[in-house]
Amino acid sequence: MSSALATQPEPAPVARVSRLRLTNTALLAGACAVLLLGPLAFGAVEPWSIFALEACAMLLLGVWASRQWINRELNLSGHVLFRPMAAFFALAVVQWLAGTTAYRHVTYTHLLLYAAYGMLVFVVTQTLRRSSQFDLLAKLFTAYGAVLASFAVLQGMAPNGKLYWIRTLEQGGYIYGPYVNHNHYAGLMEMLTPFPLVLAATHFTNGNRKIAAAGIAALMAASIFLSGSRGGMAAFVAQMAVLGLLLVRKREGGWKQPLMLGAFLALVIVFLVWMGGNELTRRLISIHSEAREEINGGVRLAIDRDCLRMLIKKPFLGWGLGTFPIVYPEFRSFYTTFFVNQAHNDYLQLLVETGLAGFSIAVWFLVLVFRQAANKLNNWTETASGAMTVAALLGCVGILVHSFLDFNLQIPANAALFYVLCAIAASNPLQESQRRRVVRRRSLIVESSPETAVS
């Protein structure tokens, strides 16, 4: 009897769940690697890096599908964003097949790129299911953001006009971090900064770790201002306004957490005063004068008007996904020696390329994101699902505000991370581990004990 018990194998369901969790974590780590290596490759804007992003996304999907085949079962989780994503992809396919696009090859290459975004979103939504994975994700984004922000600030203090101090630009640019365009660095930091900030504002860290998370978030936020991106500055202000509203709306804890947000902003200002110097002051002072210049007939306002004329020509299906730089010269209303490759307004460029049909699908997509996220905001400082939702949602808010002024969503590395954050914000609640539930219950008991004593 004892020998039989000694050789008894592990129950099949337990072993299967263990293997499933291990594979999910490996796939999630692979997706994070793709998302975080993209910015290091100059934003994944060159042919080789775009191919690498697409190939890695396809490889991750292939591994997920192979696991389903080996297990002889389809373990598929639905997601509310799959329908608008499929509708947008179908619209682009119609443009390509029906020949309504101005250049079929360009639309085809953008179809492949959007398919890669979809694959990454799919893999993340199928594998991010437990609170322990949120811990891994948040700490990974925090560490990555700290290293990248430190490098960007250091490079900004000792520039030589080259990427990584090594690669010479083929054309002009405003280098910051690994990006040719400082606005795109700011866009990346807008999406990463909320993760250490949320860690510092919730019960998922304590003591020195909470202080470290707040310090890292302050460094990342300060680097947005040091990059000189005015759109990034406006986006960060919008993010802090949303976070402030969420903290004030949360009744537990009184004014403690809003005061902590104020302390965080003070720390950001300290970083800026310490490292900013005259260049940051000049950029801040120029905001008002350049805004007035644009209103009085600047280049961006002229591009906006030209985009509206392009929309009138093809209002329903647009000119074709990715075709803006090809079609725009025909409608350009001003003289310039520069090549206008983007609209510098992601909303207008979406209208021009996909028409009212594509824009309506995008609105549908965003409405679902915010509606699903709103359902998980109760007690967001106490649950992994709520904290993850707020971090992802703040990142989305930053890019959505910045998109009025720049073209972050035309940069593959930034666009891929944005769509993944949208999917995370709109995902189903995470499964909290037993340890997390116990810790949360104890913290709630400790916080409620004074009231209990009074009663």
Model-derived segments and spans:
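Alpha-helical transmembrane segments of multi-pass inner-membrane proteins
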Residues: 1-44, 51-65, 85-98, 109-127, ...
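Interfacial/capping segments of alpha-helical transmembrane domains
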Residues: 52-53, 280-283, 318-319, 328
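Canonical alpha-helical transmembrane segments
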Residues: 61-75
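Interfacial transmembrane-helix boundary/kink motif in multi-pass membrane proteins
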Residues: 75-83
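Extracytoplasmic loops and strand-loop junctions of Gram-negative outer membrane beta-barrel proteins
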Residues: 104-107, 288-293, 383
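Flexible juxtamembrane loops connecting transmembrane helices in multi-pass membrane enzymes
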Residues: 169, 174-178, 236-240, 258, ...
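TM-adjacent membrane-interface loops and short helices in multi-pass inner/ER membrane proteins
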Residues: 181, 292-294, 299-341, 347-350, ...
